[in-house]
Amino acid sequence: MDSPATSGSLTVSFSPHSGDAFPVGLPVLSAAPVESIFAGAVPCGHSGDFALFRDGPWLLGRARVAPGSDLAQTSAQLYGQLLDAARGWHLARIWNYVPAINASTSGGLEHYRAFSQGRALAFERVFGPDFKRAVPAASAVGCDATE
């Protein structure tokens, strides 16, 4: 079987008309280079680095930050902002795109592990030592993006 044709980088958008589209550093595997999810979402503000959107009962957020030199600290800060923005909401799902996910940090820790440490610290700060009960489904997808 032939592999799918790729062209450029996949771009994700909550709504085709909201102007929030952003490249995620993944190859395009279909004819559509822009993936619109929650196509009815409308912008409803900002919180820290997050742009926020509403689609019916759903609160959606998107943040894009350069990882900097300390990925654990950056992910802890960003997840802290996410948890602040989502206070009073039940988090159902979080998607993360982590550049060079299997590469090592300057301290020798794999990017994914550093990202996960920061994420866990943010949840523990908000929910305490029993934070695992509050963690939603999540994914960390490796990508070629530099931020």
What spans do the regions from the language model cover?
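Short, polar/acidic, helix-capping and beta-turn segments at strand->helix junctions
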Residues: 1-147
